[in-house]
Amino acid sequence: MLNSKVTEEMKGHPDYWCDHIGKALNICQTIGSERMKILFDLYHVQIMDGDLIRHYQQCREFVGHIHTAGNPGRAELDDQQEINYPPIMRAIAESGYTGFVGHEFIPRAADKVATLADAVRLCDV
């Protein structure tokens, strides 16, 4: 699984292979194995490249798992962040994706379970 994370010090690892989603896609296409997949991290792709739906559609056949988080700050999914999850999740569902979506955010609220439940509801399109 190729992880689409950035190379900035606080957001990834120096010299990481897949600092842009296009690199992860190129590696998967070059390797040509059903066992090589992309961990499509919506938070990181938004920071690196933006245009989440288009980038997802370009590499959907290679996506093995999806992560969410609010941007900025990797906070919970709410109306205080820039990623509008319902249309993104609809596009992912309409593409035929049947895999898991992992919510990988850092909740600010005291009730962490309620925050997770809110994220699940927001993404359950």
Residues covered by each model-derived region:
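Histidine-acidic metal/acid-base catalytic patches
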Residues: 18-125
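Surface-exposed cleft-lining segments at the edges of enzyme active sites
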Residues: 5-16
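Asparagine-centered polar/low-complexity signal
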Residues: 3-6, 35
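Short beta-strand segments at enzyme active-site cores
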Residues: 1-4, 102
